[in-house]
Regions:
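Short, glycine/proline-biased beta-turn/loop segments that scaffold the active-site neighborhood
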Residues: 5-61, 134-154
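Active-site-adjacent helix/loop patches that line small-molecule binding or acyl-intermediate pockets
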Residues: 33-38, 42, 51-128, 136, ...
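Short helix/strand-bridging catalytic loops that position acidic/His residues to coordinate divalent metals
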Residues: 1-8, 106-109
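Short glycine/serine/threonine-biased micro-segments
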Residues: 9, 18, 58, 108, ...
Length: 203
């Protein structure tokens, strides 16, 4: 099953998570980051790593909003380097994109492999206020008599089962979804992704 089993490099589709972590670490969409050549030592007997932007151009100081909208590789690497690759790897693991990601700066450009299911599940957090919504394949299972023996619903409606309710408060629905980042970050990244379509690489 290519959606659940096939491993693929997400490439630039991973970048929103780099910028989400940046926003969680005191960056703002208007924070300036230098879009300029980066040369990194990979270790003994290995060539220097020189990531490049598409088109092999660079544009100087730019906002991280622009960095995401235009999918700038050099800016993304610099952001990941400033935040710390250990934090980025841990963040990606918490989002369940990767099980045990290597702490390499190249993962900021989506070099590590994952499945489409894991990636789309992580994307759901942007439109759900920073909560990770794990996909389900079975909604519920009932026996021959209509009794529910399995229900995937993770939300709980308080006081919904009461026969009569005379209080002033309306019943509240609480969920058990994992909070992976703030609602503010979710809102800002969603806005930045809209910019990808309006002004950036998705135009």
């Amino acid at each position: 099953n290519r959606a659940t089993q096939a491993l693929r490099q997400p490439g630039s589709a991973f970048k929103p998570f780099v910028y989400a972590l940046a926003l969680e670490n005191k960056f703002t969409p208007s924070t300036l980051v230098l879009d300029a050549p980066v040369v990194l030592d990979q270790g003994e007997d290995l060539k220097m790593w020189k990531p490049e932007n598409y088109g092999k151009k660079f544009y100087g100081p730019s906002t991280i909003r622009t960095g995401l909208e235009k999918s700038r590789n050099l800016m993304t690497v610099r952001v990941a380097q400033e935040i710390g690759i250990d934090k980025l790897a841990s963040f990606a693991k918490n989002l369940k994109i990767y099980d045990n990601p290597e702490e390499l700066l190249s993962i900021s450009l989506g070099s590590a492999e994952t499945t489409l299911l894991k990636l789309t599940s992580a994307y759901s957090s942007f439109v759900n206020g920073g909560k990770l919504i794990e996909p389900i394949f079975l909604d519920r299972i009932q026996d021959s008599e209509g009794n529910t023996i399995f229900n995937s619903e993770k939300r709980v409606c308080e006081k919904c089962k009461e026969i009569s309710y005379l209080g002033d408060d309306v019943p509240k629905i609480k969920d058990k979804f994992k909070k992976v980042f703030s609602e503010e970050t979710a809102y800002q990244i969603t806005s930045m992704l809209e910019g990808v379509i309006k002004r950036g690489t998705g135009k």
